[in-house]
Structures are given as C-alpha cells and as structure tokens.
C-alpha cells in the first residue's frame, strides 16, 4: 500500500476514535453549561434565555436593575400537577374524612356525604358556597401554628392518586430549573396562586426554594388573641381575599409593591396577571404552560374542570404571550420520569 495512503487512513481512524471518546464528554459538558437542561431547544426556551440576557446585560437600554427583576409564577398546573384535582382539594377531602369521625353531624350536608362516599359526579358540580363551606370547616377554628403542622404532616405522607408519588415529587422539573436559573440571574421569584397562602407556605421553600414571604395566595380571615397568655394568630371562618383572576394583580400590588417583568401561568385564572405584567413599561415576558402531553402527564385545556385554558389561548398571540407546549418543549416532566 502507498505510504501516503496508509498514513491518511491511520489519521482518519485516529480522528474517528478520538471523536468517539470526546463526544460523550462534550455532550455532558454542553448539558452542564445549559441552565435549562430539561427544556428542548424550542421557541419557548429561546424566548426565556434571550429575555434574561436582554434585561441582565449592563450598559444596554433594556438593562433592569436586580431590585426590579421580579418574576411571578402560578402554582397549580404551572409549577406542579393540578390533575385529577387541585392538591389543596385533595387535602380538603382527606381532612373531611377525618373530621366526620369527630363530628358525625357534618354528614347531614350533601357535600360532606359526597366526599365520604366518593361521589365524583356530585363533587365535580360543587357550588361555590359548598366549596367555601368545605374550606372553612377544614381550615378554620385553629391557630396558624396548628394549621401549619396539619399541612406539613399531610404533605409529607399524601400521595398523588395517579403517580403514587408524594405531591412534592409531582413538580415540573423544567419549571424548577427555571426558578433556579432566574435566581442565579438575581431575579426574585414569587408564587401568585389562587390556592391558599397558608396551605403553600409550610412547604414551598423546601420544594421550590421560594421563602414563605414570597408566596401570594387566597387568604382566610384571622385574628390576634392571647391563648393561655400566649400571643396567637387564630384562623377564623370566612374568606378574606381570593387571589385568582383579577385578584392576582391586586395581590401582587399588596404584597410586592412593584410590577413584575416576568409572569408564568397555565390557565384563564392567570390571564389578568399576565395582562398586568406585560402592560408594564420596558421589557416584559408573559408565558402560559399548555398541557399537551397525554403520555407523561395529562392533555387538557378548554374543557378541563381544573386549570381551564381557553381565553388565554385565544388572546395569547395578540397579547404577545408565549405558549409553552409541554409535549414539544420539555425533555422531562417529572423527576421520576426519564
């Protein structure tokens, strides 16, 4: 064989062998450098990365000082699963089953009967007044410390009815990565949820890295009093504030006092929050998670009992909001799925 041809073949083999060795390590290195590794390369991921780069680049017209970098996130259906029902509703159902043993007279009410008997048809058509009554019975007439313990004990043992995993494992890996990425870029991350503020506060820091003072949600009535000479906050019957739809911008103003520049939601209950955030001066970004993955999660939007998304889909384009397509955009949904 011609010596030059032989040398060329040797070089080709060496290069190919070197490529086989380096490819896995290069892929690993690239993945390690990717701040959102569970996101597929898509318009959604690109929009997030470009926006963050835009507002954090010093010396540019769109630079936003760290103290103004505020991002708000809905919780149910945006950060964790809301199917087959809101997690707080599952908490209410379990609480009712315990309460009726102590107070059998509660079974005189149809909503309580339906919970104990498992009448899903009735439960899917609960009136707002019945839901309020269930929340009051299961959340009120105790101190905030007592309620915190009840929530912590429940969240530590309760399991998702479909995945049979703790609810705290049923969080969306890509969204947790996003929270971490934003905080690394000096954003302050807030939860703005229609769920109960005191239901979320006991566990969100350990799951999302969001401290309790950065949680905004619906609130029940409370009162300060001395119990056995100990200063105590008591939970009372009655709803004080509903942090849903038009209540979300109000909650943001009450708790934060600044208009956020980033907003993430998944349902029509988040419409006004995204509308408020993206109407701000300067660069803003609003995004909606659309549940399109029937294999890894649940596909739903316009017809869902929980997390209905219809108006947001219709208006997203004209409002300039991005749609995050779960099936298309996420490489991984839950931590227990690979």
Residue ranges of model-derived segments:
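Bacterial N-terminal signal peptides that target proteins for export
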Residues: 1-13
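Secretory-pathway/luminal and periplasmic proteins that interact with or process carbohydrate-rich
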Residues: 80-82, 122, 202, 213
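N-terminal carbohydrate-binding/catalytic regions of secreted carbohydrate-active enzymes
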Residues: 51-70, 83-84
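Short, solvent-exposed loop/turn and secondary-structure capping segments
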Residues: 82-85, 90-93, 202-203, 276
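C-terminal cap/substrate-recognition subdomain and adjoining C-terminal extension
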Residues: 29-39, 43-49, 53, 68, ...
